[in-house]
Amino acid sequence: MAPPPPSADVPLAERLQRLASTLQFAWFSGHALLLLCVFRYAFSWIRFNYYSGMARFCYRFAFIAAAATYGIVVYKTWRARQKTGVKTSGIKDYLRDENIQYLVLALVWLFMPQYPLALLPYGIYSVFHVATYVRANLIPTLVPPQRINAPAGASPNAKPQYTQHPASEAIGVFVKKYYDSSMSMVARLEIMLWLRLILSVILFQRRSWILFAIYTTFLRTRFSQSIHVQNAFALLEARIDNLIGAQGTPPQARQVWDNVKTAARQFYAVTDLNKYESGVAAPKKSS
């Protein structure tokens, strides 16, 4: 059950102090700092000055903030499991946790060469996290909602209703309207980043192979969990099919694309852990 909104009888300074003393406020602060770093880095990037001292600081600190915010969520989840006595079935449960995935990836980006595209998914997530926190926590703290008098004949045990600030309503409309499309955008950005890493491998850029392997593992996990990632890959495949199927396309190009799709499906089948968990064992080699 959600706690009641702050009371207007409590002084504003005390309400803000209570809000700032929570772990959730630290989570919100991390996302807010991440957004500030992304905007500042984008300003440097637009000016082709993304290797300046400030740009490098904002890039690295953005991933520090991302790791901190996702680390807080992972910690709170772990603590909740400890309190309720819920046990995980092994490391696979942790690896399937989306927050752990993004936590690990943030730490990877932190110590790897700059890939500006890597900031955007975290930035988009932070927009919605910050908006949701402002709507649910910050605005009610600054402007406590008024309780709505229950209509005549209402049950005395009915849940009390409160007025909602217009800004909170506007944020709620924004989140509801743009959340799904933004998650689809995140999926497309993550695929674009994967293609960028493939180019890095082809060009033999520093640490590209290990980064490509880690990110491919991440994206494979996201594919099995996110309908948005699945739809983004399906859209990419359809567009390339349409391009390759055009009249005048060399047969060699079509053959290469068919081989790529076959290899991708084989990779998906080999890395599908669900079939091993359901009792379908991997084939054994004959001695």
UniProtKB/Swiss-Prot annotation:
Where are the bilayer-spanning segments?
19-39, 54-74, 104-124, 184-204
Q: Does the keyword Signal apply?
A: no
Give the UniProt subcellular location, in the record's own words.
Nucleus membrane; Nucleus, Nuclear pore complex
Pfam (any one): TMEM33_Pom33
This protein's record includes keyword Transmembrane: yes
Source species, domain of life? Eukaryota
Membrane topology, Perinuclear space segments: 40-53, 125-183
Membrane-topology descriptor: Multi-pass membrane protein
* Key words, A-Z: Membrane, mRNA transport, Nuclear pore complex, Nucleus, Protein transport, Translocation, Transmembrane, Transmembrane helix, Transport
> InterPro entries recorded for this chain?
PER33/POM33_regulator, TMEM33/Pom33
- What's an example GO BP annotation here? endoplasmic reticulum tubular network organization
Q: Which residues lie on this side of the membrane: Cytoplasmic?
A: 1-18, 75-103, 205-287
Give an example GO cellular component term for this record. nuclear pore
Q: Which family is annotated?
A: Belongs to the PER33/POM33 family.
What does the function comment of this entry state? Contributes to proper distribution and/or efficient assembly of nuclear pores.
Subunit structure, per the record? Answer: The nuclear pore complex (NPC) constitutes the exclusive means of nucleocytoplasmic transport. NPCs allow the passive diffusion of ions and small molecules and the active, nuclear transport receptor-mediated bidirectional transport of macromolecules such as proteins, RNAs, ribonucleoparticles (RNPs), and ribosomal subunits across the nuclear envelope.
Its name, as the record gives it, is Nucleoporin POM33
- Source organism of this protein record: Chaetomium thermophilum (strain DSM 1495 / CBS 144.50 / IMI 039719) (Thermochaetoides thermophila)
Lineage of the species this protein comes from:
Eukaryota, Fungi, Dikarya, Ascomycota, Pezizomycotina
Gene encoding the protein: POM33
